[in-house]
């Protein structure tokens, strides 16, 4: 009974490796040097598939993978339908925030009820956040380089992930509101959990025992 785990390259992949090791699983090829999108492990019954971060929930939901590791930001935007979400893995931590140009008075715009143009790739999350606060916004969907939007006049504000804040600072942007803290979650295909329970449940338990403590 084989198990397929969906991961994205980069920080999530690197920070998932110690959790896999705790479960007795080691990826035997480096994704940065290998051209393969399906990576073998030291266990013949476990393989890792490399997909875009935004595609991880879709692969797991539709059975392309049995499990996956995905950021809460992606999961919320996806909606999480058809996914069992047993664990907050507490890795790849950052925050989702609102940021503006240094010369834009965000608080005044909100107070006056002005319509604010906001660029983001997290349209669903941003829409819910501003609706809850009663802030009038026009949302502009972008896929990258969010910091450019206020600098070019495309938007008044952005909603994006922030780790250290250095990128915002380098582009003369100010973080004015924290929407939520973000970390990565383990997601499991619900059908796979039933059909492959004897193989999947020990993995979940091993991950749980290896989660970094606060």
From Swiss-Prot:
Transmembrane segments: none annotated. One of its GO terms (cellular component) is cytoplasm. Gene3D superfamilies: Periplasmic binding protein-like II. Its EC number is 2.4.2.17. It is found in: Cytoplasm. InterPro entries: ATP_PRibTrfase_cat, ATP_PRibTrfase_CS, ATP_PRibTrfase_HisG, ATP_PRibTrfase_HisG_short. Keywords: Amino-acid biosynthesis, ATP-binding, Cytoplasm, Glycosyltransferase, Histidine biosynthesis, Nucleotide-binding, Transferase. Lacks the C-terminal regulatory region which is replaced by HisZ. Belongs to the ATP phosphoribosyltransferase family. Short subfamily. This is ATP phosphoribosyltransferase. The gene is hisG.
């Amino acid at each position: 009974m084989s198990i397929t785990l969906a991961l994205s390259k980069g920080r999530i992949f690197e920070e998932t490796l110690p959790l896999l090791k705790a479960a007795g699983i080691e990826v035997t090829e480096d994704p940065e040097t290998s051209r393969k999108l399906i990576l073998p492990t030291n266990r013949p019954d476990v393989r890792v598939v490399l997909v875009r971060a935004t595609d991880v929930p879709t692969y797991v939901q539709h059975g392309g993978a049995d499990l996956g590791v995905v950021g809460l930001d992606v999961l919320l935007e996806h909606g999480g339908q058809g996914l069992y979400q047993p664990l907050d893995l507490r890795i790849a931590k950052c925050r989702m925030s609102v940021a503006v140009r240094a010369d834009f008075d965000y608080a005044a715009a909100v107070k006056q009820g002005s319509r604010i143009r906001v660029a983001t790739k997290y349209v669903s999350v941003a829409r819910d956040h501003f609706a809850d606060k009663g802030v009038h916004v026009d949302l502009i969907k972008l896929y990258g380089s969010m910091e450019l939007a206020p600098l070019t006049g495309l938007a008044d504000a952005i909603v994006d992930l922030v780790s250290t804040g250095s990128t915002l600072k380098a582009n003369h942007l100010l973080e004015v509101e924290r929407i939520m803290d973000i970390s990565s979650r383990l997601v499991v295909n619900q059908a796979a959990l039933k059909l492959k329970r004897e193989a999947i449940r020990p993995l979940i338990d091993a991950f749980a025992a290896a989660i970094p403590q606060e």
